[in-house]
Amino acid sequence: MKHAGVLALVVLLAAGCASGTASPSKQTAAKPRCSARQLAGWQRLANRIHAPVYCPSWLPDPLDGVIGSRWNNIDAVSRDRSYLESWVWQETGLGAAGGELHVNLRGYPERTRIPKCIDADTARRTLIPCFADPHGVVRERGIAATVYTVNQDADQWHILYAWRHAGSLYAISEHVAPPVNYAKVRIYLNRILRGLVLVEPS
């Protein structure tokens, strides 16, 4: 009986320890947050277009996701309220001394169809989808993004993720160019997607 009591006590203690410790696979990832500098510009953009936008809490270094920063080479809103925000870093030189990091974020308020672009490779300059050649879906934090590998305009030679939210189309893309290859760009885009913060107009 004494041995049985000790065994029961050990079982109870083990159960108590197990109930108080969550396994790593079940722990909830921290909710991403944009810095105050990042959030200020994205809030202004959301208010300007009267639609939600996605603030990137993470971009590959040295890109910062701050609208108006030294790396923000494009800050554009069209008459239809669609927007393009772009960050680029370029370094000239041979081999590892040179390279480019270029990330775009797009939004098309109240539109879910893929936009059309002029085919610059043909004399007739016909309209073709701006995003094409889908290669599966990536799911992160409630977003189901389709991966496109043939893209036009500012997204040419980029891998692009596009998804829909509340009746609007959104996209992120990154240029496949040294110092990053296709596999590394996919890793970066997955992390960017995972770190997006939805900003509603105020």
Residue ranges of each PLM-predicted region?
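Bacterial N-terminal signal peptides that target proteins for export
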Residues: 1-7
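Bacterial N-terminal signal peptides
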Residues: 7-16
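Surface-exposed amphipathic alpha-helical segments
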Residues: 17, 166-202
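Bacterial lipoprotein signal-peptidase II cleavage site
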Residues: 18-26
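Residues that cap or initiate secondary-structure elements
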Residues: 21-22, 93, 109-111, 169, ...
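N-terminal leader/targeting segments and the immediate start of mature chains
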Residues: 29-34, 40-42, 46-49, 188-202
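Short, solvent-exposed recognition patches
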Residues: 32-166
